[in-house]
Amino acid sequence: MDDLKSIIGKVATGAPLSREQAASAFDSMMSGEATPSQMGALLMALRVRGETVEEITGAVSVMRAKMLRVDAPANAVDIVGTGGDGSGSVNVSTCASFIVAGAGVPVAKHGNRALSSRSGAADVLAALGVKIDLKPDQVGRCIREAGIGFMFAPAHHPAMKNVGPTRVELATRTIFNLLGPLSNPAGVKRQMVGVFSRQWVEPLAQVLKNLGSGAAWVVHGSDGLDEITLTGPTFVAALENGHIRTFEISPEEAGLGLCDSEGLKGGDAAANAVALQSVLDGLPSPYRDVALLNAAAALVVAGRAKSLKEGVAIGKDSLDSGAAAGRLKQLIAVSNS
């Protein structure tokens, strides 16, 4: 197996790494064997040249091997974004997760604190009263009893502590911004992943295919959102039955109206928590509609809906019946017990 120095030398020439070489390099970094200089050199060389599907696949395989796993039902789904889109939007995937859970599909939500906004999934859930820093068996209990559990990334990826300081010092996006959403500790086979750039939509779908995902949508809004947007089209790469299909979707085809970007602007964790609760309480808003649209796509990925329109109808029922709000109440109770 190539040593780290020779791998860094190879990347420095612009040559791609094999999946095995990438896995070897990331194992060195995450096990603490690599020096900060070596980590910085490799991460920036990959970033400047552009990471390949094989390199990301190798890196994710190491991250998955080192994570602390959570037991979840085989049909569990995740709705997750890379963050880093710079939009400062409301917490779309978190709200959509409660809608999906309210529709009877188990959700194993993976997330972290804010990356570029003022409120990430962990921030808003903590503001709502959910205990986020749980052990894997406690998260599994949440999924079983509340129909939804939250896996706080730092608690499930302890090996990341070895690369954390280097990432902070680099202060720029690296391959690790792509790895987290692909490394769900519950090992979900069905997920919706939002990405910060259109260039990653199809490659990340290919990575998920390489790693054995059953069904997935990788999405990027035309306005830059790492979610399905309500302001215009969204680019999608869908993994279905071992094949990847690319297409665009619009809110109109799901029976929803367009909004401007101001309608999706968020605030800090406290403000976003109030906004999320108001959606679960049934109040109409662009936030409700964008959460419904993302939930609808997740319901399609989960096999619960055949189309976005049907997914929106199921999502509306989850909200209007109080089921989605009930899932949040249950998660607060179970996570704190």
Curated annotation (Swiss-Prot):
Keyword hit for Amino-acid biosynthesis: yes
Keyword Amino-acid biosynthesis found: yes
Superkingdom of source: Bacteria
Annotated signal sequence range: none
Sequence positions that bind anthranilate 2: 167
Cofactor binding summary note: Binds 2 magnesium ions per monomer.
Key words, A-Z: Amino-acid biosynthesis, Aromatic amino acid biosynthesis, Glycosyltransferase, Magnesium, Metal-binding, Transferase, Tryptophan biosynthesis
One GO biological process term: L-tryptophan biosynthetic process
Binding site for anthranilate 1: 81, 112
Entry binding sites for Mg(2+) 2: 226-227
Cellular component terms per the entry's GO annotation: cytosol
Pfam family, one: Glycos_transf_3
Binding site for Mg(2+) 1: 93, 227
GO molecular function terms attached to this record: anthranilate phosphoribosyltransferase activity; magnesium ion binding
Catalysed reaction equations from the record: N-(5-phospho-beta-D-ribosyl)anthranilate + diphosphate = 5-phospho-alpha-D-ribose 1-diphosphate + anthranilate
Pathway as given in its UniProt record: Amino-acid biosynthesis; L-tryptophan biosynthesis; L-tryptophan from chorismate: step 2/5
Residues noted as binding 5-phospho-alpha-D-ribose 1-diphosphate in the record, renumbered to the chain: 81, 84-85, 89, 91-94, 109-117, 121
EC top class named in words: transferase
NCBIfam families xref list: trpD (TIGR01245)
Chain's role: Catalyzes the transfer of the phosphoribosyl group of 5-phosphorylribose-1-pyrophosphate (PRPP) to anthranilate to yield N-(5'-phosphoribosyl)-anthranilate (PRA).
Complex formation: Homodimer.
Similarity comment: Belongs to the anthranilate phosphoribosyltransferase family.
Protein's name according to its UniProt entry: Anthranilate phosphoribosyltransferase
